[in-house]
UniProtKB/Swiss-Prot annotation:
GO terms for cellular component: cytoplasm. The lineage of its organism: Bacteria, Bacillati, Bacillota, Clostridia, Eubacteriales. This is Phenylalanine--tRNA ligase alpha subunit. Keywords: Aminoacyl-tRNA synthetase, ATP-binding, Cytoplasm, Ligase, Magnesium, Metal-binding, Nucleotide-binding, Protein biosynthesis. The keyword rRNA processing does not apply. Mg(2+) binds at residue 254. The gene is pheS.
């Protein structure tokens, strides 16, 4: 048994010294020291030895194990260092090769346009207000002069969570909340996400962005509304832009209008963006309805005001000539990298 142990030791040491890579070393380790290795097999068979032989063989076997483990560790370190140096040698950097372009983050075109619009209105003295996206029915409808059974309450247009709670269909509820808690003068915008129960297509999305504005004070007239929005249009689209107002109907304003601007693609000459008309619809607006003021605790005999609202997605599409709203929400970097 002792001769066999010495023989295993000599053979193993020879194999270890000849090992040139980590795989060979692992194979040798398993061959001699593994669960079914040659040295392990001898240790398991010591029960058949006499009492006199058992301690002698056991001591020798442990000495052989210690020698092999020490040698394996030393050779493993040397081999791994050699492999590392070989890898570094083969991975020489060619400094003449062009570098890899770093991916640089940028703002989404929606965010860019929102920031630009907010900057313009803040420069005109407007404050930015925010409110909940999950809104009470009262603030989304009744406070804004949209009573029960009004067509705008149709389940086809609105996401109802329950009878009294909806996903806001506009950012106008923010205006109602501000009027309730703050006495005039009020000058604010309320940008944010809104929700409509619309089927997804090139021009409709169930989630989109709006920015609405409100001014309340004494002696506010339609001329103030017109001047404010014309100034915004010039700052947003350039000094040469022209605007016009068309009569319209909104339940929360009276009188109401829609504002058009000369097409900034063709400068009013007519193109596919403006459908040959030379004008593009930009926003809805009007003088705040007296009932809305009363609902929010403001005396319409003392105060008046105007309100307006933009579809931010529409502004982005018009500004950049985008013909499908879905492109704004698909996170396609080939598209987004153009902005």
């Amino acid at each position: 048994m002792q001769d066999k142990l010495n023989q295993i030791k000599e053979l193993a040491l020879v194999e270890i010294k000849e090992a040139k890579d980590s795989t060979t070393i692992d194979t040798i380790r398993v061959k001699y020291l593994g669960k079914k290795g040659e040295l392990t097999t001898i240790l398991r068979g010591m029960g058949s030895l006499s009492k006199e032989e058992r301690p002698i063989v056991g001591k020798l076997a442990n000495e052989v194990r210690e020698v092999l483990e020490a040698e394996l560790e030393a050779v493993t370190k040397a081999v791994k260092e050699a492999e590392k140096q070989e890898k570094l040698k083969n991975e020489v950097i060619d400094i003449s090769m062009p570098g890899k372009k770093q991916t640089i983050g940028k703002k989404h075109p929606l965010e860019q346009t929102l920031d630009e619009m907010k900057k313009i209105f803040v420069s005109m003295g407007f404050a930015i207000e925010d409110g909940p996206e999950v809104e009470k029915d009262y603030y989304n409808f009744e406070a804004l002069n949209i009573p029960k059974n009004h067509p705008a309450r149709s389940e086809q247009d609105t996401f109802y969570i329950n009878d009294n709670v909806v996903l806001r269909t506009q950012t106008s509820p923010v205006q109602a909340r501000v009027m309730e808690k703050q006495q005039p003068p009020i000058k604010m915008i309320s940008p944010g996400k809104v929700f409509r129960s619309d089927a997804v297509d090139a021009t409709h999305s169930p989630i989109f962005y709006q920015m609405e504005g409100l001014v309340i004070d004494k002696d506010i007239t339609f001329a103030d509304l017109k001047g404010t929005l014309e100034l915004f249009a010039k700052k947003m689209f350039g000094d040469k832009v022209k605007t016009k107002f068309r009569p319209h109907h909104f339940p929360f304003t009276e009188p109401s209008a829609e504002m058009d601007a000369t097409c900034f693609v063709c400068n009013g000459k007519g193109c596919k963006v403006c459908k040959g008309e030379g004008w593009i619809e930009i926003l809805g607006c009007g003088m705040v309805h007296p009932q809305v003021l009363r609902n929010c605790g403001i005396d319409p005999e003392v105060y008046s005001g105007f309100a307006f609202g933009f579809g931010v997605d529409r502004m982005v599409m018009l500004k950049y000539g985008i013909d499908d709203i879905r492109l704004l929400y698909e996170s396609d970097m080939r598209f987004l990298n153009q902005f």
